[in-house]
Amino acid sequence: MLDINLLRNDIEAVAARLAGRGYTLDTAAFNQLESERKSLQSRMQELQAKRNATSKQIGIAKGKGEDVSAILAEVATLGDELKAAEQAFDGVQGQLDAWLMSIPNLPHESVPVGKDENDNVEVRRVGVPRQFDFEVKDHVDVGAPLGLDFDTGAKLSGARFTVLKGDIARLHRAIAQFMLNTHTGSHGYQEHYTPYIVNDTALLGTGQLPKFADDMFKVTRGGDESAVPQYLISTSEVTLTNTVADTILQESELPKKMTAHSPCFRSEAGSYGRDTRGMIRQHQFDKVEMVRVEKPEHSYAALEEMVGHAENILKALELPYRVITLCTGDMGFGSAKTYDLEVWLPAQNTYREISSCSNCEAFQARRMKARYKDENGKNQLVHTLNGSGLAVGRTLVAILENYQNADGSVTVPTVLRPFMGKDRIGG
């Protein structure tokens, strides 16, 4: 959520920055609500002062032995008027809060201005794509004989679900274990195991709600539709980041570096017809997430470091990849700046996203009331960052395609062999 004072001080400047990411700020609506808020606030102060002054007259009148019934009636009337003004004020404030919740974050000044993914800027490429001396298969054809079972997934749950069996399932598990071991052992993150079901407050805090309700799986307890709504997590960013909600941290507790391996559940409501073949876009997929809670002055250095941590996984797996900076029009709702890491998929002859690392600055912290006490004892909002480290299923896809052999086998990347106990599967 944006700082409302930015809007009060220079709404046109905010509107211009938001326009860069394709969002039209309704300045007239804000100015109208803000005018009503100020008017009601003044009215409340006026009524409160008048009621206080009138109440004092009661004691004076009683001291003189005068009848106070008229004064009491006036105080009661003023009380009713004040209550009505307070209710009206709360209504306008609620509208302002809801309106603020729907506005995306402001892009950082270093973010390239652009409309969509075509305007993203490549930062670097690492690794050289392998040259094959046989016809390359995609991960579906490579994986099917090895235990990648889409038919059973569809039978059990419908489209965009997959069953992994045998060595494919072991490889999937090994990938996640390697990622967690690297982030906890080499990168300094603390491992967490968090719930897969959360309440709407948590999703409001990290920005998935209210804007992205259609992309969530809503669950009910015992089929009770009147119960407080709960949702399957779309990413463990939600749970990890919300561990600091409604919290005042000590400066010595920062930075907080957290990681978790979890399934992620997404309805993919806006993705009809996209990536219908294979594991690229699933309703359920695993991801190892990195979350950092930082002092504001350190958050952009932390973003670069987090990108490096995601890159280290790809480097260790010896998978070619590139890093891109997302333009203003392609960034996520809560992000001030985002880097995507894209891995090379030889069957598609292109790079595909495997990690997204974002600095949300104080956007989530303001929604969650996540603060720290600075050196002067003043409470300040923290900055929150999140990044995939990495998407496990897409990493499996990349390994199947980049490490495939002519005989149908797949070479196990060197760093995964201790987890697998073998150097290849299939064949």
Curated annotation (Swiss-Prot):
Residues where ATP binds: R266, S267, E268, E353, I354, S355, S356
Gene Ontology BP annotations: selenocysteine biosynthetic process; seryl-tRNA aminoacylation
Molecular function GO labels: ATP binding; serine-tRNA ligase activity
Localization of this protein: Cytoplasm
A cellular component term, taken from the record's GO annotations: cytoplasm
CDD domains to which the protein is assigned, alphabetical: SerRS_core
Binding positions for L-serine per the UniProt entry: T235, S236, E237, E289, S388
Pathway per the UniProt entry: Aminoacyl-tRNA biosynthesis; selenocysteinyl-tRNA(Sec) biosynthesis; L-seryl-tRNA(Sec) from L-serine and tRNA(Sec): step 1/1
Main location: cytoplasm
Keyword annotations: Aminoacyl-tRNA synthetase, ATP-binding, Cytoplasm, Ligase, Nucleotide-binding, Protein biosynthesis
InterPro entries assigned to the protein according to its UniProt record, in alphabetical order: aa-tRNA-synt_IIb (IPR002314), aa-tRNA-synth_II (IPR006195), aa-tRNA-synth_II/BPL/LPL (IPR045864), Ser-tRNA-ligase_type_1 (IPR002317), Ser-tRNA-synth_1_N (IPR015866), SerRS_1_N_sf (IPR042103), SerRS_core (IPR033729), tRNA-bd_arm (IPR010978)
SUPFAM superfamilies according to UniProt: Class II aaRS and biotin synthetases, tRNA-binding arm
Function description: Catalyzes the attachment of serine to tRNA(Ser). Is also able to aminoacylate tRNA(Sec) with serine, to form the misacylated tRNA L-seryl-tRNA(Sec), which will be further converted into selenocysteinyl-tRNA(Sec).
Family under the similarity heading: Belongs to the class-II aminoacyl-tRNA synthetase family. Type-1 seryl-tRNA synthetase subfamily.
Domain writeup: Consists of two distinct domains, a catalytic core and a N-terminal extension that is involved in tRNA binding.
Protein name per the record: Serine--tRNA ligase
